[in-house]
UniProtKB/Swiss-Prot annotation:
The keyword Transcription does not apply. Substrate binds at residues 264, 321-323. Pathway: Carbohydrate metabolism; tricarboxylic acid cycle; succinate from succinyl-CoA (ligase route): step 1/1. GO terms for biological process: succinyl-CoA metabolic process; tricarboxylic acid cycle. Its EC number is 6.2.1.5. Residues 9-244 form the ATP-grasp domain. This is Succinate--CoA ligase [ADP-forming] subunit beta. Its cofactor is Mg(2+). Pfam families: ATP-grasp_2, Ligase_CoA. It catalyses: succinate + ATP + CoA = succinyl-CoA + ADP + phosphate; GTP + succinate + CoA = succinyl-CoA + GDP + phosphate. It comes from Cupriavidus pinatubonensis (strain JMP 134 / LMG 1197) (Cupriavidus necator (strain JMP 134)).
Length: 389
């Protein structure tokens, strides 16, 4: 789950990480009121969407008068903001952050992620803040410093000070940087975040350390114990189909292809998508129905896939372990009839009650294309989708 910058800064503030004074605004009138409350002489008008690159896309403006605030708020609110992370369709801006200006002397970068290799927390920091860390990694990787943190120990004073000095924090500001780094770490750990990023973390002309931006991603599997994080959820920023899928306990992610995929198990779903691509096809979605799929669940899964007008064929790939193949067959038959399926459907089933499931499909009278192996299923669905063009 992602949250907005201003929400991330609320979290940082709770952990004593210095952030600029700022007020969220949902209208031009609220933006003007916020600017007046903050006082001048400089304000920053920032679009709030779940994507990076807002500045380059025209979503961050420095205002030097109240009239500027009004102009920028009017232009940004409601705009379809396109960045390198949104795709060409962009995202509509429904809220702003009006923030006091900052005296930027130096921009730094710091982030925390879960490192799957070490199974610990990795802190990454760089003297090259204010730009995409991917660019730094590609062109000047030596400027990225990584520290693997043992969760039982946490981020020690010595390690925090060492990282601060490595990224160019002067001695007079190291104590402030330590406070910011340890606060970020504590926020990351306490909230079950999967990513916490400050870009940039700035040094001001007076030597102050301030988090000028904040990005958090949270582990959705841990949200049950963080109602305060769930309260930050902005459904306008999420895919409508993914929201609908969550109501039926379906793991669904929209993609750009034309072949719908219905699979049980995330690993098999990924392998299915890879195999489709291997034979020249493009998946239209990731869809894991899990181990407890019912007829209703399968029907809803079909409905979700077919809401995408680009879907020209569907592949159902099921391994019957916990999930019985005859139950899936019943769901596929019922779903095909319920949605009046008109696109080609390829079904591959292996495992528990496989023969019964296959017989049910064969006796259904529906034009279902059977496949025995994953490679055969992928080839058939790619060919079927090509035949629809």
């Amino acid at each position: 789950m992602n949250i907005h910058e201003y929400q991330g800064k609320e979290i940082l503030r709770k952990y004593n990480v210095p952030v600029p004074r700022g007020i969220p605004a949902f209208s031009v009138a609220e933006a003007l009121k916020a600017a007046e409350e903050l006082g001048g002489p400089v304000w920053v008008v920032k679009a709030q969407i779940h994507a990076g690159g807002r500045g380059k896309g025209g979503g961050v403006k420095v205002a030097k008068s109240i009239d500027d605030v009004k102009t920028y708020a009017t232009n940004i609110l409601g705009m379809q903001l396109v960045t390198h992370q949104t795709g060409p369709e962009g995202k509509k801006v429904n809220r702003l952050l009006i923030e006091e200006g900052a005296d930027i002397k130096k921009e730094l970068y710091v982030s925390l992620v879960v490192d799957r290799v070490s199974q610990k927390i990795a802190l990454m920091a760089s003297s090259e803040g204010g730009m995409d860390i991917e660019e730094v990694a590609a062109h000047t990787p030596e400027k990225i410093h990584t520290l693997i943190i043992e969760p039982s120990t946490g981020l020690t004073d010595a390690d925090a000070d060492d990282i601060a000095r490595k990224i160019g924090v002067p001695d007079a500001s190291v104590a402030q940087a330590r406070q910011a780094l340890q606060g970020l770490y504590k926020a990351f750990y306490d909230t079950d975040a999967s990513l916490a990023e400050i870009n940039p973390l700035i040094l001001t002309g007076e030597g102050k350390v301030i988090a000028l931006d904040a990005k958090f991603n949270f582990d959705s599997n841990a949200l049950f114990r963080h109602p305060e994080i769930v309260a930050y959820r902005d459904l306008d920023e999420e895919d409508a189909n993914e929201i609908e899928a969550s109501k039926f306990d379906l793991a669904y992610i929209s993609l750009d292809g034309n072949i719908g995929c219905l699979v049980n198990g995330a690993g098999l779903a990924m392998a299915t998508m890879d195999t489709i691509k291997l034979f020249g096809g493009e998946p239209a979605n990731f869809l894991d129905v899990g181990g407890g799929a019912t007829t209703e669940k399968v029907t809803e899964a079909f409905k979700l896939m077919l809401k995408n007008p680009n879907v020209e064929a569907i592949l159902v790939n099921i391994f019957g372990g916990i999930m019985r193949c005859d139950v899936i067959a019943e769901g596929v038959i019922s779903a095909s009839k319920a949605v009046n399926l008109t696109v080609p459907l390829v079904v591959r089933m292996k495992g528990t009650n496989e023969d019964l499931g296959k017989k049910m499909l064969a006796d259904s009278g529906l034009p279902i294309i059977a496949a025995d192996t994953m490679e055969e299923a992928a080839q058939k669905v790619v060919a079927a989708a090509a035949g629809k063009k």
